[in-house]
UniProtKB/Swiss-Prot annotation:
Protein name, entry field: Nuclear distribution protein PAC1
Complex and partners: Self-associates. Interacts with NDL1 and dynein.
Lineage: Eukaryota, Fungi, Dikarya, Ascomycota, Pezizomycotina
An example Gene Ontology molecular-function term: dynein complex binding
Membership in a protein family: Belongs to the WD repeat LIS1/nudF family.
Organism of derivation: Blastomyces gilchristii (strain SLH14081) (Blastomyces dermatitidis)
Main location: cytoplasm
HAMAP family: lis1
Location in or out of the cell: Cytoplasm, Cytoskeleton; Cytoplasm, Cytoskeleton, Spindle pole
Keywords: Cell cycle, Cell division, Coiled coil, Cytoplasm, Cytoskeleton, Microtubule, Mitosis, Repeat, Transport, WD repeat
Ranges for region Disordered: 80-99
Amino acid sequence: MSQLLTPRQAEELHKSIIAYFLSAKLPKSAAALREEIADSVQLDDSTAKKYEGLLEKKWTSVVRLQKKIMDLEARNSALQSELDSATPTSLSRRNQDPVSWLPRAPARHRLESHRNPVTSVAFHPVFSSLASGSEDTTIKIWDWELGELERTIKGHTRAVVDVDYGGPHGGTLLASCSSDLTIKLWDPSDEYKNIRTLPGHDHSVSAVRFIPSGAAGSPLSGNLLVSASRDKTLRIWDVTTGYCVRTLHGHVEWVRDVVPSPDGRFLFSAGDDRVARLWDVSSGETKSTFLGHEHFIECVALAPPTTYPYLAALAGLKKPPPPSSSAEYVATGSRDKTIRVWDSRGTLIKTLIGHDNWVRALVFHPGGKYLLSVSDDKTIRCWDLSQEFKCVRVVTDAHAFVTCIRWAPNIIKDAGGMGVNGDINGGGSLALSGVNGIIPGSKKEDPGGGAKLGIRCVIATGSVDLNVRVFAS
């Protein structure tokens, strides 16, 4: 002991141990230690109070430090692996190719204004506007290119849980849902005026998404909105009338998340019953169920057609599905800390393990090669589909749980002009709304008459640390 500790350190250790024995009502042990050290330690009541709890604090500090060291070693190992797999040529190509772009810390912008945790983010399909919802009951509109707050929208009386841009052609709207049981529609072209409130759910509304107009047979051509709720239902709304046109029953617990397919034909939902469901919008029937998670399912994502070659190979298929098909593959994230990837029949393809806490949100890279996930472990993880979902990057920039992630919509280049709300009317370029930025029935490089899709290398995340972060190339 004398070789490891100075006399003063040894004395403080003895005092801490004796104080611990006394606080734990072990006077005999304290007396025995005093006798062993020849009662050289003077410990009156005030001194004992000073040292009480010090031993426990030292112990827990060591445990926390050990965990931090292990986390840093794992991070160092991941970075070393990434460095080893990169050559100057591949790095140069990756930096220039949007298909291979992945976010890096630090974020380009850290947007601060919310007073409570950020629950959701959404990009405007045309302009550089980013909406964020928060438990502080507000929605904030930011210019993500400049990193500036444009306006604060008030109207909900409880936490705003989700936000989404979409709506009919030529009339982009912002939808929000809340723990106050309502969905609200806001008009970006009229200073985000609240144009409609949709009541009907019997409990908190946990997710809201516009259903894309999509392919032939898709009803009402972009006028539909889907919501998920703690009342165990999904509701489909006509945004032009405000009426609920269909209620979907099937889940037996809180429905946490829902996303539509790019062609508007299917919905994918999941929640606290640990079951994900694929729904046919036209019939309202469940097409497939997905079973396997051991805890609540927090989030879902539909894989865009650009992922099909990678996922078909993992599923053992010789030929991928045609790009015109939708909802061929899906992903779910859960409080069991795993991500699961499935085919449309409910067959499990891959289980992704790596997060140390609840998985809160998922988004596929528009280029098709990566899946990004965020978690209560404060990280963004990037999984490479071409390497059987190997985690190739861990981004640690947040200081608390990361609650949401969205990718900026793709841009259609040389596809005709755009009106104020995204309607095509001349020459120019148009940002692409919808799920994962995919045009239903179109090829990535030729979506209708020579237009090309330009991937925007921009993502946004929200966190319990009250910040919205924008990562961009």
